[in-house]
Curated annotation (Swiss-Prot):
GO terms for biological process: secondary metabolite biosynthetic process. It comes from Aspergillus terreus (strain NIH 2624 / FGSC A1156). InterPro entries: FAD/NAD-bd_sf (IPR036188), GMC_OxRdtase (IPR012132), GMC_OxRdtase_N (IPR000172), GMC_OxRtase_C (IPR007867). Belongs to the GMC oxidoreductase family. Disulfide bonds: none annotated. The gene is atC. This is Glucose methanol choline oxidoreductase atC. Pfam families: GMC_oxred_C, GMC_oxred_N. Keywords: Glycoprotein, Oxidoreductase, Signal. PANTHER family: GLUCOSE-METHANOL-CHOLINE GMC OXIDOREDUCTASE (PTHR11552), GLUCOSE-METHANOL-CHOLINE OXIDOREDUCTASE N-TERMINAL DOMAIN-CONTAINING PROTEIN (PTHR11552:SF228). Pathway: Secondary metabolite biosynthesis.
Length: 606
């Protein structure tokens, strides 16, 4: 059983299940001491300098550091989430704490960048808090832990967009497998899976099914079947055309989150000489006169210094901060750089552009069964859940409140315009338009906050056509970038959102356990009323991508090539979701891990 450090940084109800975990590594040393940390405010040099200790960054760092005589430094603006927010990231059931949606105050503040979008025209001028991990593990420490792969056709599209068949399903599958240590379920009838898409060797990332089947899962399987969706053999075989229980990045030994920090970093700290620079802001990538990246200007607690790279700088700061740092370093559209007095190193128009995201919408319902919707707010229910979690590693805290996920192209398209149909036809044939899942925590109405019988039947619109951007707010790296998701700016997305709400209502009715709809409510009927409700309540999908998009050299909007190398300079790569040429369907985590594995292998092959 993997052990976790003992840290005291807990707040409110979410501290209930905090346990005393051991704190020593395989050498008997305390992990927070030793030689794994850089000397702050002192210049130093390494073979590889990685900016951002998130999902991709720690994967690449661990793979590089595992090689003999290779020195690796990771620059991270945050620290260990076990220190900064206790066990809120570790315990799966506490993940709802990150879903602040319309609350513009980030929570917990120490592991979230607190990014706020520009007012969204398509969302009736609302601003959205965009959760993004400011911690080791990045957004893999904050997300809902759903782990599945995209469709074969979507990977084929990736390959076509960048003119490189490395990104087809067959060629990418070894990298999709490489990170994953899959644990088979005890009940294969309840949790179907395809063993051929996992590697028996496995990697450090723990992928499994939860120890606990949420009440929502039973009625959603019934509803999906009655609504015409077909059961499929898991969600990791390149098919998303039906429904199945999803796998999660949860360690089956103790039912804790398996983030890139818990998986890749903890193992690397035990076995490699990786060096961490924590609570350290990367301010600028440094270049020599030949436009070769040779270091990063950083700041820790007001002290500015340089971390030099003898071989490469690898930018893994995420979909918002990677383009921001490129722009601050002189890589981007020349006009926008000159506006801030930033010397142009490489004139790349695509930096910060082409932002993709999904759209999250929901319906809320009162049910005639217990759903565990009150488990995080009712002290008695929480105490019971904590006891089950700590003593048996089961119960509602082992999951996110729902785990059966459905996918489809909307069957009722009579209200779609010809233009919408043409737009949707441009996506790959196996690209689902909508994802469905029922979630219980957080679904109680304000009038009945402690109830335990509500559920949200939710949808994430997948085939979105609205595109946003990331821009500099100023030349000061301390200032957050300007983020505009441009949600619902494309008419096809509006048609899909209205259709998805109608379909959610059908699915909720088909559960057989619904008492009444709470939201949007029976007074919201016409397409115009539904769309207005969506504009007032929908949020982004927290799957932003493609702001440093990959492409071949003939693409004027490409920022990196197919090996993540930034055009116009040398020894600089971008390895995170920002480098994807477009957003594959579903939750992109598995694709990001695979991309990081592929690029790490490419770096080591040189």
């Amino acid at each position: 059983m993997r052990v976790f450090p003992t840290y005291i940084a807990v707040s409110g109800l979410f501290g209930g299940a905090f346990a005393a975990f051991g704190a020593t590594n395989i050498k008997g040393q305390t992990k927070l001491f030793g030689t794994s940390f850089g000397i702050l405010a002192k210049n130093a040099s390494y073979d590889y300098v990685i900016v951002g200790g998130g999902t991709a960054g720690l994967t690449v760092a661990a793979r590089l550091a595992a090689q003999p005589n290779v020195s690796v430094a990771v620059i991270e603006a945050g620290s260990f989430y076990e220190i900064d927010n206790g066990n809120i990231s570790q315990v799966p059931g506490y993940g709802a704490n990150y879903l602040s949606f319309n609350d513009l105050t980030p929570s917990p503040v120490l592991v979230d960048w607190g990014l706020i979008t520009e007012p969204q025209d398509g969302l009736n001028n609302r601003q959205i808090h965009y959760s993004a991990g400011k911690t080791l593990g990045g957004s893999s420490a904050l997300n809902d832990m759903i782990f599945h792969r995209a469709t074969k056709g979507s990977y084929q599209r990736w390959a076509e967009l960048v003119d490189d068949d490395t990104y087809t399903w067959d060629k990418l599958l070894p990298y999709l497998k490489k990170s994953v240590d899959f644990t088979k379920p005890k009940d294969a009838a309840t949790y179907p899976y395809d063993a051929s898409v996992y590697s028996p060797e496995g990697g450090p990332l723990q992928v499994s099914f939860p120890n606990y089947r949420a009440p929502c899962d039973d009625f959603m399987e019934t509803a999906f079947t009655k609504s015409g969706l077909k059961p499929i053999k898991g969600l990791n075989s390149g098919h998303l055309d039906g429904f199945a229980p999803t796998t999660f990045v949860i360690n089956p030994a103790d039912q804790t989150r398996s983030s890139s920090e818990a998986a890749f970093l903890q193992e690397a700290l035990d076995t490699t000489a990786m060096t961490l620079y924590l609570r350290t802001l990367a301010k600028k990538i440094l270049f020599d006169t030949n436009k070769t990246a040779n270091g990063v200007l950083v700041e820790t607690n007001g002290a500015e210094y340089t971390i030099s790279a003898k071989k490469e700088v690898i930018l893994s700061a995420g979909v918002f901060h990677s383009p921001q740092l490129l722009l601050l370093s002189g890589i981007g559209q020349a006009d926008s750089l000159e506006k801030f007095g930033i010397p142009v190193i490489s004139d790349l128009a695509g930096v910060g552009q082409n932002l993709w995201d999904h759209l999250f919408i929901f319906t809320s319902h009162e049910m005639n069964i217990t759903t565990n919707s009150g488990v995080l707010v009712d002290p008695e229910l929480l105490a019971e859940a904590v006891e089950s979690y700590l003593n048996q590693q089961t119960g509602p805290l082992t999951g996110i409140g729902g785990g059966v996920v459905g996918w489809e192209k909307l069957p009722n398209r009579v209200s779609f315009s010809n233009s919408t149909n043409e737009t949707l036809a441009s996506f790959p044939d196996d690209f689902p338009e909508v994802e469905y899942v029922a979630l219980a925590p957080g679904s109680n109405p304000a009038s009945d906050p402690l109830a335990n019988h509500f559920a949200s039947v939710t949808a994430a619109v997948q085939s979105t056509s609205s595109r946003g951007y990331v821009k500099l707010r100023s030349a000061d790296p301390h200032d957050a970038p300007i983020i505009n998701i441009n949600a619902l700016s494309h008419p096809a997305d509006a048609d899909l959102a209205v259709g998805a709400i109608k379909r959610l209502r059908q699915i909720a009715e088909a559960t057989g356990v619904r008492v009444k709809e709470v939201l949007p409510g029976p007074e919201v009927v016409s397409d115009a009323e539904i769309l207005e409700w969506v504009r007032n309540n929908a949020v982004n999908g927290y799957h932003a991508s493609s702001t440093c998009a990959m492409g071949n050299s003939s693409n004027p909007d490409a920022v990196v090539d197919t090996r993540a190398k930034v055009y116009g300079v040398s020894n600089l790569r971008v390895v995170d979701a920002s480098a994807l040429p477009y957003l594959p369907p579903g939750h992109p985590m598995s694709s990001i891990y695979a991309f990081a594995e592929l690029i790490a292998e490419d770096i080591l092959s040189k």
